[in-house]
A protein has these predicted regions:
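A short, exposed loop/beta-hairpin motif centered on an aromatic-Gly-Thr core
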Residues: 1-10
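Short secondary-structure junctions
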Residues: 22-30
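Hydrophobic beta-strand residues in large extracellular and virion-surface proteins
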Residues: 29-32, 49
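Short, solvent-exposed loop/turn elements at beta->coil junctions and helix N-caps
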Residues: 33-39
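C-terminal edge-of-domain segments
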Residues: 41-52
Length: 52
């Protein structure tokens, strides 16, 4: 199973939670939110992850 993150560069995946799990064109896509430390504080980003 290959996992590909569609997010900005320079983000460290510290923790994440699954918000949504859907199938698009026979490809499973989940929307997750995760926290990354940038300049001393944590920020939550949202992105999609493809599982093949």
């Amino acid at each position: 199973m290959n996992v590909k993150f569609f997010c900005n560069r320079g983000m460290n995946l510290l923790e994440y939670q699954v918000n949504e799990w859907i199938e698009v064109n026979e490809v499973e896509v989940i929307n997750i939110s995760f926290c990354t430390e940038t300049y001393g504080y944590s920020t939550t980003y949202y992105c999609s992850v493809l599982y093949k």
